[in-house]
Amino acid sequence: MVRSVWKGPFVEGSLLKKADAARASGRHDVIKIWSRRSTILPQFVGLVFGVYNGQKHVPVSVNEEMVGHKFGEFSPTRTFHGHSGDKKAKRS
């Protein structure tokens, strides 16, 4: 389900403060965030966020194509190690 238009995009308040401070200072450090549910806004383009995936902060460099998506989409939480092989002995 899509969020209703009249509500606007959800962004954590602390995330906005961190992004504004990074823009004002002009430094390009990784901004650590835990809010995977926050929407990426146009003012975040060009910044690098460290999105927490449960183990570590995955660096996500925001570009124009990411606007409107959620931060969690770019920081996978599960690792796929492949399906197990055939346990039966193969006959030739």
UniProtKB/Swiss-Prot annotation:
Q: Which SUPFAM superfamilies match?
A: Ribosomal protein S19
Keywords, A to Z, come to: Ribonucleoprotein, Ribosomal protein, RNA-binding, rRNA-binding
Quick check: keyword Ribonucleoprotein in the entry? Answer: yes
GO biological process assignments: ribosomal small subunit assembly; translation
Can you provide one Gene Ontology molecular function annotated for this UniProt record? rRNA binding
- Write down the InterPro entries for this protein, in alphabetical order: Ribosomal_uS19 (IPR002222), Ribosomal_uS19_bac-type (IPR005732), Ribosomal_uS19_CS (IPR020934), Ribosomal_uS19_SF (IPR023575)
**What is the purpose of this protein?**
Protein S19 forms a complex with S13 that binds strongly to the 16S ribosomal RNA.
Query: Know the name of this protein?
Result: Small ribosomal subunit protein uS19
